[in-house]
């Protein structure tokens, strides 16, 4: 099953949109944009499913959850960064290994959001580090839905170093 159109970078337009959104947020005065929250956590091998989650926004309106299983090596330090737009209608969740490429073999992964719907989601086999750039997974290796970015069983090649999600608040009916 193909990923919903417009949710992933196929032509570069979504990357441009995300870059512009992030640049606009970076150029605004600090007092008008919520401070991003970055939390370090260990990604642990052993084949057991683990989860890590964080909340952000007024009243912890949004949640980002990273669920995974991996093999090989030892624990790796990863980070989850969350931030909201000035009007709190958009939030970003970035999960990554700051040292670039992970040496763990991921058997599965899923990054999901609560309280919002994904407008852009991307997964990378290698995160930017020093002079190296992000290397995205192939489109067939992962899927993006309204609430999650996750591996495609049988197609995912077990390399993961970064996930990026930009989501918009779900509308609440009166």
UniProtKB/Swiss-Prot annotation:
User: Span of the secretion signal?
Assistant: 1-32
Compartment annotation: Secreted; Endoplasmic reticulum-Golgi intermediate compartment; Endoplasmic reticulum; Golgi apparatus
Question: Might you report a single GO cellular component term?
Answer: endoplasmic reticulum
Write the record's keywords in alphabetical order, separated by commas: Angiogenesis, Apoptosis, Endoplasmic reticulum, Golgi apparatus, Secreted, Signal
Q: Name one GO biological process term.
A: positive regulation of transcription by RNA polymerase II
Q: Which InterPro entries match?
A: MYDGF
* Lineage: superkingdom: Eukaryota
Which Pfam families does the entry link to? UPF0556
| Family per similarity comment | Belongs to the MYDGF family.
Q: What does this protein do?
A: Bone marrow-derived monocyte and paracrine-acting protein that promotes cardiac myocyte survival and adaptive angiogenesis for cardiac protection and/or repair after myocardial infarction (MI). Stimulates endothelial cell proliferation through a MAPK1/3-, STAT3- and CCND1-mediated signaling pathway. Inhibits cardiac myocyte apoptosis in a PI3K/AKT-dependent signaling pathway.
Q: What is the protein name for this chain? A: Myeloid-derived growth factor
**By which gene is this protein encoded?**
MYDGF
């Amino acid at each position: 099953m193909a990923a919903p159109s417009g949710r992933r970078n196929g032509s570069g337009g979504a990357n441009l949109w995300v870059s512009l959104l992030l640049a606009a947020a970076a150029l605004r005065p600090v007092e008008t944009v919520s401070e991003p929250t970055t939390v370090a956590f260990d990604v642990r091998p052993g084949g057991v499913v683990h989860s890590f989650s964080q909340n952000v926004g007024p009243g912890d309106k949004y949640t980002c959850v990273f669920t995974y299983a991996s093999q090989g090596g030892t624990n790796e330090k990863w980070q989850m960064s969350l931030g909201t737009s000035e009007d709190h209608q958009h939030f970003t969740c970035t999960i990554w290994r700051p040292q670039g490429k992970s040496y763990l073999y991921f058997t599965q992964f899923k990054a999901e959001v609560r309280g919002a719907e994904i407008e852009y989601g991307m997964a990378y086999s290698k995160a930017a580090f020093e002079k190296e750039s992000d290397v995205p997974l192939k489109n067939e290796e992962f899927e993006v839905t309204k609430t999650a970015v996750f591996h495609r069983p049988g197609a995912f090649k077990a390399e993961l170093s970064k996930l990026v999600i930009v989501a918009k608040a779900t509308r609440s009916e009166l």
